[in-house]
């Protein structure tokens, strides 16, 4: 005799089979020209609607120049790698369930985005607009948005108030754009109360961006022209754990004496800069990249972030550094034995 769990599984399998068959029959019997966007099984003829995944609409790699009408059942919309130049309101007027839109690799401009086209999507969580022709961060955007991907555009402007209502945004990717220091005001990031990852690598910044969101945990600023870090800069982002500043123009003169002595930072990347001395670090730091600078000496009085405790608790309370890169500098052997004595948890040391 079948158990209750087996019966439930059997019923679910039957229901799924019936749904899939009904979808397939709808596609086979109906002429696409007769379909209406309000129909349960409507599928734009330019796209593919998999019967086994009825909430997804695949329209990628089809040479489309316009966005087709989006059925109301769709949660996931794939429109990448087309020739689309605009985002009007009308195709989305019934798409009230959309959670995910991928419009990467198109030709979308700010002028082509109708004002209410995106903000009307009240349930949208993920918006991908990478590799387009945007010159500023689009606005207005839906309050529900959690991730905004704008890499590899031409963004040089962030209009005032763009992020003021995006309190649910956790990830903002602006890498490989044309941002200068004048793109930021003191309140540019106001409203991003839950932002955790901010990527502005490969821009043209010379200074650290001001007033970052307090919950920022991952900050990526590689491949800019940043020359220094203001005193107490990290006080406003007390949760920052991953900091990447590779390929900048940081020098000793541009760093406060305790610029990186920040207890929250676990991974610090300063490769390919112009540092001549080992920066002061915090005992909590786990990964440190200092390769390809101009460091000549290893001064243990600066490097070792705390006075070593008794041998029995050094592993618990001492420096937590486990990975250190110093290759590509001007350091001459021998390396001080105190280096190993200080960093007892060191597992990888590249020099």
Curated annotation (Swiss-Prot):
Domain LRRNT: 34-72
Keywords carried by this UniProt record: Disulfide bond, Extracellular matrix, Glycoprotein, Leucine-rich repeat, Proteoglycan, Repeat, Secreted, Signal
Ranges for the LRR repeats: 73-94, 97-118, 123-143, 144-165, 168-181, 194-214, 215-236, 239-259, 264-283, 284-305
Compartment(s) of residence: Secreted, Extracellular space, Extracellular matrix
Location (main, coarse): secreted
Transmembrane stretches, start-end: none
PROSITE patterns xrefs: LRR
GO biological-process terms attached to the record: cornea development in camera-type eye
Tissue and organ distribution: Selectively expressed in cornea of adult where it is detected in keratocytes but not in scleral cells. In embryo, first detected in periocular mesenchymal cells migrating toward developing cornea on 13.5 dpc; expression gradually restricted to corneal stromal cells on 14.5 to 18.5 dpc. Detected in scleral cells of 15.5 dpc but not in 18.5 dpc embryos.
Disulfides per UniProt: 43-49, 47-59, 304-342
Residue ranges of coiled coil: none
GO cellular component terms given for this protein: extracellular region
Post-translational modification: Binds keratan sulfate chains.
Glycosylation sites per record: 94, 168, 223, 299
Leader peptide range in chain numbering: 1-20
InterPro entries to which the protein is assigned, alphabetical: Leu-rich_rpt, Leu-rich_rpt_typical-subtyp, LRR_dom_sf, LRRNT, SLRP
One Pfam family cited in the UniProt record for this chain: LRRNT
Function noted in UniProt: May be important in developing and maintaining corneal transparency and for the structure of the stromal matrix.
Family: Belongs to the small leucine-rich proteoglycan (SLRP) family. SLRP class II subfamily.
Record-given protein name: Keratocan
Native source organism of the sequence: Mus musculus
């Amino acid at each position: 005799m079948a158990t209750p769990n087996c019966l439930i599984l059997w019923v679910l399998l039957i229901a799924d089979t019936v749904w899939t068959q009904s979808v397939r029959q709808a596609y086979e019997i109906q002429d696409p020209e007769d379909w209406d966007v309000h129909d349960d099984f409507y599928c734009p003829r330019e796209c593919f609607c998999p019967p086994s995944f009825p909430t997804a609409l695949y329209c990628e790699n089809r040479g489309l120049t316009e966005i087709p009408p989006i059925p109301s059942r769709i949660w996931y919309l794939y429109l990448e790698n087309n020739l689309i130049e605009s985002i009007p309101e009308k195709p989305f007027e019934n798409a009230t369930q959309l959670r995910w839109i991928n419009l990467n690799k198109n030709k979308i401009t700010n002028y082509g985005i109708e004002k209410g086209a995106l903000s009307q999507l009240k349930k949208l969580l993920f918006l991908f607009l990478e590799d387009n022709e945007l010159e500023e961060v689009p606005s207005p955007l839906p309050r529900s948005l959690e991730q905004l991907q704008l890499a590899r555009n031409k963004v040089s402007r962030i209009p005032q108030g763009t992020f003021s209502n995006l309190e649910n945004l956790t990830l903002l990717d602006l890498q490989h754009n044309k941002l200068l220091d004048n793109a930021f005001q003191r309140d540019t990031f106001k409203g991003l109360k839950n932002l955790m990852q901010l990527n502005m690598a490969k821009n043209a910044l010379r200074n650290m961006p001001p007033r970052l969101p307090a919950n920022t945990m991952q900050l990526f600023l590689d491949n800019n022209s940043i020359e220094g870090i203001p005193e107490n800069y990290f006080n406003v982002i007390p949760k920052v754990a991953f900091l990447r500043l590779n390929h900048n123009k940081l020098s000793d003169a541009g760093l406060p004496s305790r610029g990186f002595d920040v207890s929250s930072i676990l991974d610090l990347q300063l490769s390919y800069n112009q540092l001549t001395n080992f920066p002061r670090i915090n005992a909590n730091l786990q990964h440190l990249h200092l390769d390809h600078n101009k460091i000549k000496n290893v001064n243990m009085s600066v490097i070792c972030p705390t006075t070593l405790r008794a041998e029995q608790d050094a592993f618990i309370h001492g420096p937590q550094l486990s990975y250190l890169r110093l290759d590509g500098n001007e350091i001459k052997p021998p390396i001080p034995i105190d280096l190993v004595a200080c960093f007892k948890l060191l597992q990888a040391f590249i020099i």
